[in-house]
Amino acid sequence: SKKFFGPAHLRALHLIERNPGINLGELIFKLKVTKQSLNRVLRDLIKSKMIKQIQDENDTRKKNLFLDKEGKVFFEIVYNSQKKRIFNALKNSSSDSVIKFKNVLKKIIDGK
């Protein structure tokens, strides 16, 4: 049975998928979380074989994070499911609603 992953797990998976080889410090910075809270999430993801840590070749103190096979499959399922839901919602909306939605998304992305 699959373990339940919360929003923190999904955010970490997403960033690791988008930035293969990201190290712990970079991930903490991008997620704006404490090392302690991220460690719990990473422990869960490693135990579930979603991600793997590989020691940095240039700096042995650093560990680089990558999606494992299981993590790649899981990410694709979640991503495709979300993509389908968004596509269907936009397809069944008026052009005015779509424009308003794009404006809201832009504000979210810009942090306003």
Describe each model-derived feature in a short phrase.
Residues 95-112:
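C-terminal regulatory/oligomerization modules of transcriptional regulators
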Residues 43-100:
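Charged, amphipathic alpha-helical coiled-coil/dimerization segments
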Residues 24, 42-43:
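Short, hydrophobic-biased segments on the C-terminal half of alpha helices
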Residues 1-34:
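N-terminal helix-turn-helix DNA-binding core of bacterial DNA-binding proteins
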Residues 20, 31, 35, 79-82, ...:
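Flexible interhelical turns and helix-capping residues at alpha-helix boundaries
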